[in-house]
């Protein structure tokens, strides 16, 4: 009997599950000590509110992870300011007005779509998982109301596999849906007989295990455009349902799972290093230090006591102001502490602070909280900017991987979905069939470009200083190129800079106006001179009289 699709996928899932097992103990430990409610290794954990932070005494690691996620959100994909822009591969075409306006319009529509969707609620969770577990995953799906709908996956709930290029192209996700959700999403005819019986009996909120697999559709028929022959196959099925029944079999034009990794070792599928993994040892040590400090204080304030045997089974009190009566016996000290504890916690507190600093450094807290932790009022603005840029450069490699594995696929898929729904204006004719590229202009992306920005500003200032002594030095500066380069590296809107062809037209018009004004001024000067001559009295001993006499003298000589 031929193997069914569900049986084949279950076999592939078993292989992915076996491959992931070596990562799970590390992830569980990270979850226990840093992010207790950020994992889901069992589908039965859904809607469970049991306490999970029993191993955390000092929450420095948890707060550092929160700072990293918030800092990456505000520094990379902040909804409060533009963080990406579209461009053409040819830089000269970016100076063409219609192209510049079309790209700006498309970018604005994409930003509006992102703001309307739940993308900015999902990204902080993705960044948090990425920083603590070195791997994150988020689905970007089509939605009838918001165009796109994102769904972040908790660590432990998904299984990944790489393509030959080393990028993730396969994802299996095991999760739970209620009977009501299954019927609403897939229809009563597509669910198993067990779910049908639950529905008919009114058991709507019982949880059912579901598997969703997305993988390359290698055997697709490229001549067909139906959902089953798209580049990526999507299959939903019940884990415990019938072997020959699927909930839904469809496909995607683009891989819908964004799965960035903080750092990858060789051919590994999952991330191998991240701030959470670096900080795990200090986080565990910090819990022990805090426990010892509390024990030290507890022994000093509530010490163990020794007493004579005569007090056995007698009333003894340790309450403030209370009295315990004993008979003083020679050679005995009476009711007293077993040993005296000197609660000198200075060294312990210093060790705790040092451990906290290590944790914060691992999570780049000093980078994101730099302006708060440093007194910048007494520092020049240039020094503050330079210090901030230097700190942000530390995240350069992480940003490049995040762009490649998350943000680029996110923008490509969102753009393609808008094209399929005819939500974009028609492009100019010169852009027909031209690919687009994405440039990032977030705070952190601009920090990577700030070195070139500072160099450009320094060069222009240097030429300006030379021009004060030698004005011809300005001939060496291409002002138009300097303005375009500065605006490009600053990330300002393209509509702020006037296209080059409009600049040339304005300059020609200005030159023509100046030429006309000069000709008019010369004509007015000539007319004014003629008028002055015509109004002058020749009888006066003036220049005209002298001229008349000279003319008459010449006439007499000629006669």
Located regions from the model:
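Short, Φ-rich (hydrophobic/aromatic) sequence segments
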Residues: 60-76, 110, 114, 121-131, ...
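Structured, contiguous alpha/beta core segments that scaffold functional sites
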Residues: 14, 142-320
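Charged, amphipathic alpha-helical segments
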Residues: 113-122, 209-221, 465-469
């Amino acid at each position: 009997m031929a193997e069914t699709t569900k049986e084949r996928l279950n076999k592939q899932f078993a292989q992915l599950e076996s491959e992931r097992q070596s990562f799970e103990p590390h992830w569980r430990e990270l979850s226990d000590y840093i992010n207790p409610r950020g994992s889901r290794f069992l589908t039965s954990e859904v809607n469970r509110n049991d306490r999970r932070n029993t191993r955390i005494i000092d929450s420095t690691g948890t707060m550092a992870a929160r700072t990293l996620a918030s800092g990456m959100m505000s520094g990379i994909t902040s909804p409060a300011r533009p963080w990406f822009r579209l461009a053409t591969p040819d830089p000269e075409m970016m100076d063409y007005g219609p192209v510049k306006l079309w790209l700006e319009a498309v970018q604005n529509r994409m930003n509006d779509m992102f703001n309307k969707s739940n993308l900015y609620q999902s990204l902080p969770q993705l960044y948090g998982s990425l920083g603590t577990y070195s791997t994150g995953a988020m689905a970007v799906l089509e939605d009838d109301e918001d165009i796109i709908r994102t769904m972040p996956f908790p660590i432990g709930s998904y299984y990944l596999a790489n393509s030959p290029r080393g990028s993730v192209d396969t994802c299996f996700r095991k999760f739970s849906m209620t009977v009501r959700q299954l019927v609403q999403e897939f229809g009563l005819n597509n669910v198993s007989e067990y779910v049908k019986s639950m529905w008919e009996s009114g058991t709507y909120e019982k949880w059912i295990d579901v598997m969703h697999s997305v993988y390359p559709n290698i055997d697709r028929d490229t001549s067909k455009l139906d959902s089953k022959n798209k580049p990526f196959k999507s299959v939903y099925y019940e884990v415990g349902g019938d072997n020959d029944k699927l909930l839904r079999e469809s496909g995607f034009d683009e891989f819908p799972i964004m799965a960035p990794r903080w750092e990858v070792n060789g051919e590994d599928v999952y991330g191998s290093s991240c701030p959470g993994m670096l900080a795990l040892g200090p986080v565990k040590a910090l819990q022990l230090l805090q426990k010892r400090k509390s024990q030290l204080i507890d022994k000093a304030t509530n010490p163990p006591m020794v007493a004579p045997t005569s007090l056995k089974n007698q009333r003894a009190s340790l309450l403030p102001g209370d009295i315990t009566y004993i008979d003083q016996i020679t050679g005995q000290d009476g009711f007293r502490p077993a040993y005296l504890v000197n609660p000198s916690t200075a060294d312990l507190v210093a060790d705790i602070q040092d451990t906290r600093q290590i944790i914060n450094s691992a999570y780049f807290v000093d980078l994101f909280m730099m302006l708060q932790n440093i007194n910048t009022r007494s520092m020049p603005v240039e020094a503050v900017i330079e210090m901030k840029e230097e700190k942000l450069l530390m995240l350069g490699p992480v940003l490049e991987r995040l762009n490649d594995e998350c943000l680029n696929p996110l923008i490509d898929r969102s753009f393609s979905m808008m094209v399929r729904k005819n939500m974009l204006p028609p492009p100019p004719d010169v852009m027909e069939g031209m690919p687009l590229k994405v440039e990032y202009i977030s705070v952190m992306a601009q920090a990577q470009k700030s070195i070139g920005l500072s160099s450009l500003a320094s060069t222009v200032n240097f030429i300006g200083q030379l021009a004060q002594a030698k004005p011809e030095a300005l001939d060496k500066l291409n002002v138009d190129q300097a303005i375009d380069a500065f605006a490009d590296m600053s990330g300002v809107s393209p509509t702020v800079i006037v296209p080059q062809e409009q600049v040339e037209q304005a300059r020609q018009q200005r030159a023509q106006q100046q030429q006309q004004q000069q000709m008019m001024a010369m004509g007015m000067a000539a007319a004014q001179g003629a008028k002055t001559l015509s109004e002058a009295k020749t009888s006066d001993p003036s220049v005209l009289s002298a001229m008349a006499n000279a003319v008459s003298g010449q006439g007499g000589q000629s006669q």
